[in-house]
Regions:
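N-terminal cap/lid segment of alpha/beta-hydrolase-fold proteins
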Residues: 19-46
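C-terminal catalytic histidine-bearing segment of alpha/beta-hydrolase fold enzymes
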Residues: 33-38, 93-100, 231-285
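Primarily recognizes the serine-hydrolase "nucleophile elbow" in alpha/beta-hydrolase
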Residues: 116-181, 198
Length: 285
C-alpha cells in the first residue's frame, strides 16, 4: 500500500493535471484567469511540444469542454503537453444587453493580454512543468483561433508562439465575411464600428514575415463562421511565404473540436493530420 502511494506521488506531476493556476497571481493585474495543465508523461512526450488551447465562443463565452479540456486530454494522450486557457470574454450578460456602451467590460486587448501572460507563465515555469520553453505553441478554435493567430501579429518576439493551430477560425473583422458576433464580443458595443480596430484585428491584413508555422483547417459547409475567413488567411500566409498547411474539408460544419461524435467522419480527420504536422515541425522549431 505504501509503495503504491509512493509511486503515485512520484508520478503526480505527470498525471492528468486539473490543478488550475491563476496566471495573473502576484502581478499588478488583479484578475483571475485560469490555466489548466495537462502534462504528458516523460516516456510519452513527443519532442516536448507544449500547446496552449484557446476554446471558441465568439469572445462572449467558452466552449470549455469540446474545444478546451477534451482537446487537452487528447493532446496529452498523444504525448503533447497542453494548457487550457480560460481567457477573459465579454460573458453572456454582455451578449444579451448592451451595457458595454456605458461600462467597459471585458474586451480587446484583454483576451490577447491573457494569452501573452499565459505564454510568459509557462516559459517562466518550464522547469516546474518539465516543458521546453522554446516549443510553446497555441491552438485555437473559432474565436479562439482568432486569438491564437493574433499572437503572431501583436506580440513581441520573445512572447511569440512557436507555432499556431487554427481550427475553423474567425480571421477578419471586416465585411463581407466577418463573424459579427465575435467582432462585437471582442471590440465591445462602444467600439464595434471603430475602423482602425477593425483593420488592426483583421488578421489577413497584417501577417508578419516572422510568423511561425501555421496549421489551418475548416469546412466549406461551416454555418457559423464563413469559410472564406480561412481562405483569406491562407492567401495571406501564402503571399508572405509563411510555412503553413491549409486543409479545407467539404463537410463538418463548426464546433466539433476534439469530439469523436460531432462533425463528420471527414472533418474528424483533422486530429490525425494535425498530429502528423506537429511531429513534422517539432524538428524545425
Amino acid at each position: 500500500m505504501y509503495r503504491l502511494v509512493f509511486i503515485l506521488l512520484l508520478n503526480l506531476p505527470f498525471t492528468m493535471v486539473r490543478a488550475q493556476v491563476n496566471i495573473w497571481e502576484g502581478t499588478t493585474v488583479h484578475k483571475r484567469v485560469e490555466l489548466t495543465p495537462y502534462i504528458a508523461e516523460p516516456r510519452q512526450a513527443s519532442g516536448n511540444l507544449t500547446v496552449i488551447v484557446c476554446p471558441g465562443g465568439s469572445y462572449f463565452w467558452h466552449d470549455s469542454e469540446i474545444e478546451g479540456h477534451e482537446v487537452g486530454r487528447w493532446l496529452q494522450s498523444n504525448g503533447i503537453n497542453a494548457f487550457v486557457l480560460n481567457y477573459r470574454t465579454a460573458y453572456v450578460p454582455a451578449f444579451i444587453t448592451h451595457h458595454r456602451l456605458i461600462f467597459r467590460g471585458n474586451r480587446y486587448p484583454d483576451p490577447q493580454d491573457d494569452l501573452c501572460q499565459a505564454i510568459r507563465y509557462i516559459k517562466a515555469n518550464a522547469e516546474k512543468y518539465h516543458v521546453d520553453a522554446s516549443k510553446v505553441g497555441v491552438m485555437g478554435f473559432s474565436a479562439g483561433g482568432h486569438l491564437a493567430m493574433s499572437a503572431t501579429e501583436l506580440f513581441d518576439a520573445e512572447d511569440m508562439p512557436a507555432f499556431v493551430v487554427a481550427v475553423y477560425p474567425v480571421v477578419t473583422m471586416t465585411e463581407p465575411c466577418v463573424h459579427k458576433r465575435s467582432r462585437r464580443g471582442l471590440l465591445g458595443d462602444s467600439r464595434s464600428r471603430n475602423k482602425d480596430l477593425r483593420d488592426l484585428l483583421s488578421l489577413e491584413r497584417h501577417v508578419p514575415s516572422t510568423c511561425p508555422p501555421v496549421f489551418l483547417v475548416n469546412c466549406v459547409d461551416d454555418p457559423i463562421v464563413d469559410y472564406r475567413n480561412a481562405v483569406l488567411l491562407d492567401s495571406a500566409l501564402t503571399a508572405r511565404k509563411i510555412e503553413h498547411q491549409y486543409i479545407q474539408f467539404k463537410t463538418g460544419g463548426h464546433g466539433f473540436g476534439a469530439s469523436e461524435q460531432k462533425g463528420t467522419a471527414e472533418s474528424r480527420q483533422w486530429k490525425s493530420m494535425c498530429l502528423e504536422w506537429l511531429h513534422k515541425i517539432k524538428k524545425q522549431i
